[in-house]
């Protein structure tokens, strides 16, 4: 798993060069992984500071397509995609649909897609109460429409789904695992792993 890079607002003029370096690095990682039968999963992430450059989910898909390496796939983190789409005023469903054809790994956890922005909570429970940030909540606790997403999208063969439910929700993990298994059947995914 590899998160995409970031540029600060004062570095935005370097965007094209940074994207080229990232593609070259992913190609090198793919070449290294190939003899071991391992896939490098390039994960979408969300903006963490004003003016920052992060690739949107659709741009992550374009990067994976440009790299065009059998050992480099996209990783959809649904909550990250939801947060970034909200922050940038993009259509969440269109963004993940752009990633799906090159996706070989999924991270599932729920949220409301509201960016953390400038609010810094004193306790994690505050973010949950207000529904902001990367909450890593059990499936069904946020407002991601899991059923329609998995009914509509097709991923690469042998795609791995991994739950990323936060440790404070450990008692809810069995129910989330049951939901994840049902979702995997909707899309014919090969395996489900719990964290």
Q: What name fits each language-model region?
A:
Residues 28, 57, 61-195:
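Histidine-acidic metal/acid-base catalytic patches
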Residues 1-73:
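Active-site acidic/histidine proton-transfer and metal-coordination neighborhood
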């Amino acid at each position: 798993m590899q998160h995409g890079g970031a540029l600060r607002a004062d570095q935005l003029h370097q965007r094209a060069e940074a994207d080229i370096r990232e593609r070259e690095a992913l190609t090198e990682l793919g070449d290294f992984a190939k003899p071991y039968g391992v896939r490098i999963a390039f994960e979408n992430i969300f903006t963490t500071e004003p003016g920052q450059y992060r690739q949107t989910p659709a741009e992550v898909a374009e990067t994976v397509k440009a790299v065009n390496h059998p050992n480099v796939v996209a990783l959809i983190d649904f909550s990250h995609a939801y947060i970034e789409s909200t922050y940038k005023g993009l259509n969440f469903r269109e963004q993940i649909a752009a990633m799906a054809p090159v996706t070989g790994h999924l991270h599932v956890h729920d949220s409301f897609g509201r960016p953390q922005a400038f609010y810094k909570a004193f306790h994690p429970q505050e973010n949950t109460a207000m529904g902001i940030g990367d909450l890593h909540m059990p499936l069904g606790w946020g407002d991601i429409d899991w059923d329609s997403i998995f009914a509509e999208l097709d991923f690469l063969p042998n795609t791995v789904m991994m739950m990323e439910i936060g440790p404070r929700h450990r008692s809810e993990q069995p129910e989330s695992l049951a939901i994840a298994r049902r979702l995997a059947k909707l899309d014919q995914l090969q395996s489900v792993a719990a964290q």
